[in-house]
Structures are given as C-alpha cells and as structure tokens.
Amino acid sequence: MDKIVIKGGQALHGEVQASGAKNAALPILASALLADGTSTYRNVPALADVATMLKVLRTMGCDAERDSETTDVCRVGVNGHITPEAPYDLVKTMRASVLVLGPLVARFGRARVSMPGGCAIGARPIDQHLKGLKALGADIHLTEGYVEATAKQLKGGTVNFDVITVTGTENVMMAAVLAKGRTLMENCAREPEVEELAKVLNKMGARIEGAGTSSITIEGVDGLKPVEHAILPDRIEAGTLLVAAAISGGDVLVKRVVPEHMDALVEKLREAGCTITTEGSGLRCKAPQRLDAVNITTTEHPGFPTDMQAQLMALMSVSQGTSVISENIFENRFMHVPELHRLGADITIQGPTAVVKGVKGLSGAPVMATDLRASASLILAGLRAEGRTDVSRVYHLDRGYERLERKLSALGADIRREKA
C-alpha cells in the first residue's frame, strides 16, 4: 500500500495539463454496450476507477482494453454475445459500475447488476435509476443484493426524477436511446459530464435534445453504431490544481480545461483574493501568501460542486477570517475534518455545516485519507503545512486523480510516493 509524503512550504509555479474527466469517461465507456463493433476513446485518464470499468466490461464479454500503460486511448469492442451481469466483487469497489444497467437492459433485454459500492459518502441510493427504468417498461426485482431488470422492448415514457441525480440521469438516458418512441426526462442533472455523454450518444446515432438542461427529450432509434471520441477535461482535477496554486501562494497555469465549466469555483477563488485569468483553453491562478475566508454552499451544477468542497475546506483552514461551508449534496462528507484537525486546522461541524476558523499555519503530521476528495484535501493541506505530512490510504486518490503527485512535483512541490 502506498502513501504520499509532502514537505510543505513550497510555492507552486509553472504549467500543468488537466487529464480527461473520470466522471465523463465512466458512463461513456459503459455506453459502448449500446452498439456492435469497436468504439475508440481518447484522453481517457489512467485511473483505478477506469480500470475497474474496463474490467466490468471484459467480465461481460467485451474486448475492453487500454492501448498501453502510457497511452490515453481505450477501445471497447462489443459483439452480440454478452453476459449481461456485473458481479459484486467488481461493483462493490466502484458504484459507477451501475451505469451498465441501462445499456444492458436496453440492448440485450436483461441485466443483473450488483448493488453498488465505492466511496463511503452517505447512502447514495439508486432508487431513481430504477424508477426511470420502470417508467420505460422494465421489470425490476432486487434479489440477493442484485438488481435484475428485464424488458423485451423498452418503451418511451415520462421520467420525473424526485431528486437530481447525475448517474441516474445518465443511466436512464442510455436506456431511452433504444426505447420505442419518445422519452421526456424532467429534473435532470445538468453537469457537463451529462452533456458530454449525450454528445457521444448522438454521434452514435441517438436523437437527444436538451442535455445540459433540466429537461431532456429522446426519440428512440432502432440501433446505434460505434464511435470515436476524445473525453473532455476533468474540471475537478483542474480545480484541485488551481487550489494547489492558491494554498501555496503560487502562480500556476492549468492548461486544457473548459473555463465555463469552472465558473462557480473561479468565483470563490477570486472572492478569496486570487487573480484568475483565462489564457486560451487554460486558467491561471496567482495567489497572495494568505487569502480571505469565503462561505461555500454545495449545490447541483452550475452551483459549487460537492467534489470541490474538501479541497476548499483545506484552503479556508489557512485563510484570514471564518468560513461557513454547507454541504447540501451528500451526508457524511466531512470525514476529512478529523484529519485536518491533526494538521492544526480549527474546524467545527454543526450538522451539514462546517465552521472553519482560519489559522496562520498548519503543522505536518501523519494523516489518513477516507475517500477520494478527502485525499486531495489532505495533500493540499500538506503543501501548506510546515514540516512533513504523510498521507496514507492513497488508493482513494488513485481512483480519481492521474498521478497527482507527479503533476504537483513538476510545479515545485516537495512530494513523493512511497510504500507505506
């Protein structure tokens, strides 16, 4: 098992490139099930979660591989001989594995998918996925920890999500593209990754309108064809790199991003005192030695993303003043707070709200990552802390960040990966 070792105090400078978006790559890889033939995807990040999705697809009979360990190209080949089952030993490690459910029942008429696992952040149920598939005519049973869905032919219908769900929107959208007739989806997630999936499906021959808004209309088609597509940049990784510049008092250009996808974060960084400029398809963050406290409320896109909450908390822990951070998306998403306390942060949790009183400095200490974004938060805090910080259980980090320690090192951080 690896750990990340950081010696803090170095201001970051230079240029770094964002990798492809994990949260776009996973549903797009699953969408390959909707067509016979080989789909080719570029700019696919080398992440543990991507490797898990490829393994899920191989388990079902697909030819799903990365071209090599050093390339960003993945290919998924599908023929008619698919075993439509995603087993527990894989799905338990990554809840996004449930994204194969919609494509399987739409294309092959049946699916058996284990109930999902992944990060230990609240309940994150899949009831809205199942509600949507039922509205399209699927017969669904929960048996021995598995979702079993069958349908001779899905039929278009109206799906009104009770709560906004990104993976639920994606799963039902993938099912509806092969349903007979028109499907209207309401209260949909508006994340860029949903819009990206719709773009890929339309390239395959689907007829989707409205993705990126709360109302999506889909005209079902008889079949789809394989596709070639480059995955959009990861706005959360890019945001984490901008916060790394901010917390270190540095000057960093994050290249190959989509600036408009990051408006909510950029607004908060500017409010805190950073200078953020757009340079082509990149964002530059130049930060003073100490920033001002800002309040943060996580909401669905286009609001402030929950996946950046832990990173901003690390930044606020060394800002001037008091910050109030309200988490409205997931319960139990303050698990990084006790570890930040170990570094000297002054944070009080009051239900879904954290009150962060900025301190002048942090001190290095051994800490433990509890989930994906918490691991990034602790690394960011370690960049600012005086002395040595050891972050253990970084397998969480590898689920969603492509060689983050190498990117930070190239910007001047004293950071390395070691065997724990």
UniProtKB/Swiss-Prot annotation:
Which pathway is this protein engaged in? Cell wall biogenesis; peptidoglycan biosynthesis
Leader sequence residues: none
Q: Where found?
A: Cytoplasm
| Gene Ontology BP, a term | UDP-N-acetylgalactosamine biosynthetic process
Q: Name the EC number(s).
A: 2.5.1.7
> Where 2-(S-cysteinyl)pyruvic acid O-phosphothioketal occurs, residue numbers?
119
This protein's GO cellular component annotations are: cytoplasm
- Residues where phosphoenolpyruvate binds: 22-23
The residues that hold UDP-N-acetyl-alpha-D-glucosamine are 95, 124-128, 307, 329
Please give the SUPFAM superfamilies that the UniProt record associates with this protein.
Answer: EPT/RTPC-like
Alphabetically list the UniProt keywords. Answer: Cell cycle, Cell division, Cell shape, Cell wall biogenesis/degradation, Cytoplasm, Peptidoglycan synthesis, Pyruvate, Transferase
Report the family membership: Belongs to the EPSP synthase family. MurA subfamily.
Q: What is this protein called?
A: UDP-N-acetylglucosamine 1-carboxyvinyltransferase
Recall the taxonomic lineage recorded for the source organism: Bacteria, Pseudomonadati, Myxococcota, Myxococcia, Myxococcales
